[in-house]
């Protein structure tokens, strides 16, 4: 009698264990697709964030080069027009001729960079990824350095002239130097953007 009772009480316990095991299996089986879906969403989100960051960097670099283009144009145009006769002619001063030369160089460089950007926007062929970023970084740095050297060379002579005579010639010289300095700032910031893009470049 006691054996029968034990057998009958053991059967439900075994059924309960089997049911629990089946439930665990169902949970595990349903969790795998959910984990895979979550992982896929994470990858997609990371890719979207990367695209947005690249787009922001591209727009920032282009905007800074547009500003540098405008400032460099003003720098050499204002200095080139700074001709008021006698000693008040920029051609008489090596420092001012240097400002004009570097302003023209910066203008040409930024023009070429903007043309490259336009080619990319229209789906044209540009340099390969890493090479393009290296060209941007090196070009921005070198041009910014040259602009800063031109500004540094022209400031002392302008200050000495203004101590003796503050006139339209010295004012125009100061305005040109200021434009060259703003062009330097824009290209220096653009070099930082290019450097960040170079550091984040993938090597696959």
Swiss-Prot record:
Q: Does RNA-binding show up as a keyword for this record?
A: no
Q: Does the keyword Plastid apply?
A: no
Q: Which residues cross the membrane?
A: 61-81, 99-119, 131-151, 176-196
Name where it mostly resides: membrane
Give residue spans on the Cytoplasmic membrane side: 1-60, 120-130, 197-204
Query: What keywords appear on the UniProt entry?
Result: Cell membrane, Membrane, Transmembrane, Transmembrane helix
One Pfam family linked to the record: CASP_dom
Q: Which domain of life is it from?
A: Eukaryota
Example GO CC term: the record gives: plasma membrane
**Sequence ranges on the Extracellular membrane side:** 82-98, 152-175
Membrane association type: Multi-pass membrane protein
Q: Where in the cell is it found?
A: Cell membrane
Could you say which protein family the record assigns here? Answer: Belongs to the Casparian strip membrane proteins (CASP) family.
Summarize the subunit comment.
Homodimer and heterodimers.
- The identity of this protein, by name, is CASP-like protein 4B4
């Amino acid at each position: 009698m006691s054996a029968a009772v034990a057998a009958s009480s053991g059967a439900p316990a075994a059924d309960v264990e089997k049911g629990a095991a089946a439930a665990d299996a169902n949970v595990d089986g349903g969790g795998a697709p959910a984990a895979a879906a979550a992982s896929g969403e994470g990858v997609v989100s990371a890719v979207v964030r990367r695209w947005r960051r690249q787009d922001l960097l591209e727009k920032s670099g282009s905007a800074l080069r547009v500003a540098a283009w405008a400032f460099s144009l003003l720098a050499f145009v204002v200095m080139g027009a700074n001709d008021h006769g006698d000693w008040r002619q920029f051609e008489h001063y090596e420092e001012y001729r240097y400002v004009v030369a570097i302003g023209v160089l910066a203008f040409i460089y930024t023009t070429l960079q903007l043309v490259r950007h336009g080619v990319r926007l229209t789906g044209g062929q540009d340099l390969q990824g890493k090479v393009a970023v290296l060209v941007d970084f090196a070009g921005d740095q070198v041009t910014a350095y040259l602009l800063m050297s031109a500004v540094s060379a022209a400031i002392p002579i302008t200050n000495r002239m203004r101590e003796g005579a503050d006139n339209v010639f010295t004012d125009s010289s100061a305005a040109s130097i200021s434009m060259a300095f703003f062009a330097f700032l824009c290209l220096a910031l653009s070099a930082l953007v290019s450097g960040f893009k170079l550091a984040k470049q993938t090597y696959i």
